[in-house]
Amino acid sequence: MQGTQQNDMFRHVVFFFIFHLFCVEVHGVEAFAMEIAGLVTRVQPLFLRTREYCKPYLTDKTPEFSVQVTAEDLSFQQSLLEAEAVEEGLKIRMFTEPFLERATIQRRIADYLLARNTVMLHGSTVAVDGKAYLFTGPCGTGKSTHTRLWRELFGHRAVMVNDDQPFLQITSSGVLAYGSPWSGKHGLSTNVCVPLAGICFLNRGIENHICRISAKDGIQSLYRQIHMPVDEDFQRKALSLADDLAGKVPLWKMYCNKELDAAKVSYSAMRGEYI
């Protein structure tokens, strides 16, 4: 146990040493405002590249919320990611400071948006003819591959809303899917708001098969894919929104391969139009 504590202490000492060597001083980086899911946030970053990362979402509107990132925030974010890796049985790794800053901003905004009935969910979301379809599941199940097949199938009719972590706003009339800068390794997102027509839980399969499932059958899978805050009150709100989401949007379960026919099968079922 003592050795583990010493290793943790050494890792965080190294983290702060690297941070002070390479961090751009905060007073030298201009603040900016961006709009995510209808929320305008003023961001005071540590790194110049953060503004560029968020460029499609920049706005001149008056901010309603503010995020200022510190060195302590980056260390805390690293510890959160390490805990997630341990929980999922993955290898612990050190993330770059700019990445940790972006993740910190994302987490703060996601937590704040819960009060506006908006939750962030891990999944790849594509829109076709003005309706959005979200594909979710554990890492490695082929979410990005599946939405790429949709784009190949529909061409200009398909718009990539977000390839990794879209925001979903629950309203009295349905659910709206929003793009965001946090869009995975491929950086595929569009600053749009589109009605969500369905959520599909993907699994790898040899043959393509999709079926509708009930909210009761899908809710546990949905819980595992939503953004889970650190604060317990926020956690309860996130779980409550997941319950609402399951009752507002059709849920599907699919086993699929990587052939173009997989996109045809999922679209035909979720849209109700056979192609």
What are the residue ranges of the model-derived segments?
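N-terminal amphipathic/hydrophobic targeting modules at extreme N-termini
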Residues: 6-8, 12-17
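Long, basic/Gly/Ser/Thr-rich N-terminal segments
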Residues: 19-92, 96
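Glycine-rich, often acidic-flanked micro-motifs
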Residues: 24-28, 37-52, 64, 95, ...
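Short, intrinsically disordered, mixed-charge
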Residues: 59, 110, 114, 152-156
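Extreme N-terminal, non-catalytic leader segments
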Residues: 77-129
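Conserved lysine of the Walker
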Residues: 143
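Post-Walker A alpha-helix
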Residues: 146-147
